[in-house]
Curated annotation (Swiss-Prot):
Species annotation: Enterococcus casseliflavus
Protein's name according to its UniProt entry: Glycerol kinase
Keywords: ATP-binding, Glycerol metabolism, Kinase, Nucleotide-binding, Phosphoprotein, Transferase
Family listed: Belongs to the FGGY kinase family.
Binding site for ATP: 14-16, 268, 311, 315, 412
Entry-linked HAMAP family: Glycerol_kin
Pfam family, one: FGGY_N
Pathway: Polyol metabolism; glycerol degradation via glycerol kinase pathway; sn-glycerol 3-phosphate from glycerol: step 1/1
Gene encoding the protein: glpK
Residues modified to Phosphohistidine: 232
Amino acid sequence: MAEKNYVMAIDQGTTSSRAIIFDRNGKKIGSSQKEFPQYFPKSGWVEHNANEIWNSVQSVIAGAFIESGIRPEAIAGIGITNQRETTVVWDKTTGQPIANAIVWQSRQSSPIADQLKVDGHTEMIHEKTGLVIDAYFSATKVRWLLDNIEGAQEKADNGELLFGTIDSWLVWKLTDGQVHVTDYSNASRTMLYNIHKLEWDQEILDLLNIPSSMLPEVKSNSEVYGHTRSYHFYGSEVPIAGMAGDQQAALFGQMAFEKGMIKNTYGTGAFIVMNTGEEPQLSDNDLLTTIGYGINGKVYYALEGSIFVAGSAIQWLRDGLRMIETSPQSEELAAKAKGDNEVYVVPAFTGLGAPYWDSEARGAVFGLTRGTTKEDFVRATLQAVAYQSKDVIDTMKKDSGIDIPLLKVDGGAAKNDLLMQFQADILDIDVQRAANLETTALGAAYLAGLAVGFWKDLDELKSMAEEGQMFTPEMPAEERDNLYEGWKQAVAATQTFKFKAKKEGE
């Protein structure tokens, strides 16, 4: 018998799939990544082919073994983390999807969400699920598929169809149809799950006419769900033992195990998630209440706020405005800015997220003078990411009544020292960058490793953690208050501009 000295994380994202093998110290031993196609059948629609996702996952599992030289039988357990909300419906008998998967960003089910609001279900759905009614979540996507794919409703009523988010789909495929499960964190993003009773909500299922026979069984985030079929894992039957949606996996990977701990992942957008402990905190400001993770018989809840534009603002400087050639260059240029921070960029390219929720707003720039330079503009764009993060974190503080002593950060833009220092300054709290920016995959690996006894408990995980770089606030209070006041005025001004064409005869 080979010694089982490794765990594998499968990180199934929106544009690519990755497999990463970690050793007992949480060090990366090998990895593989593969992109897969995105489909945009109509404006605002985003779809994936679930078989292409499965194909990419098979490919990266092989790639990780090849790169690391590790054999499949040396893997103690597999953890899965995934793009959340993306919806697959497949035929129970053939295992074939009935249509493309509808991706979390896709707006094709917006009319269904709008109708639910018109019919007065907002309060009921918020109280039960912790979510706002939106096409973002899986519920309206399932309804859309049942409405638009011929014969789907009838098949669903006859118990012939299964629904799952990507985690469910991958477990079903890896076990060759033996296991149909999901976990608390993914279930809490469907808008069908009662986060208080920890069960699928019959009232919401009836409202949307979704048969409960389609739904996966909901399990904790760290337990053995089933074993890979040997022919799907290169000859080995390995326990699949951890699962969590990507943002919750990052929370766990950042070891935010205590109430009040908070992390910000700076990706294309930025996702801020706060551990609120064993009681769900419903937000008065349209932040999302969600399940962080459930482990050892306990469930930990979280508040989540998202910013639509973070890393994509830096891409805009590079690709749209051509002010920089590479993303890291934004830091060099911003460091050379000479102005008094009088320029404000409000990157509302697709509207404003929490806590403004203004989908009609568009980007704006304020405070330009004849002396404004490219460097000032780049710095203002970076600062906008930090201002938006402060908007969300201040709202979380207000909603939860929990003091926030430290912000843990990860994701691509967290590599930018200037941005992280400004984030600490504007929040007036310490900001700690993860030593290992692979926090999402690491979170999935930890959950799986704990379930199979690879690691003993949370204390052992904490003892392995490397301390990342700490950024401490250095800005005087008066300067901080004035800068943030300017940001709030810039956002207010942005929201007043809504272009309407002049009507005939005006």
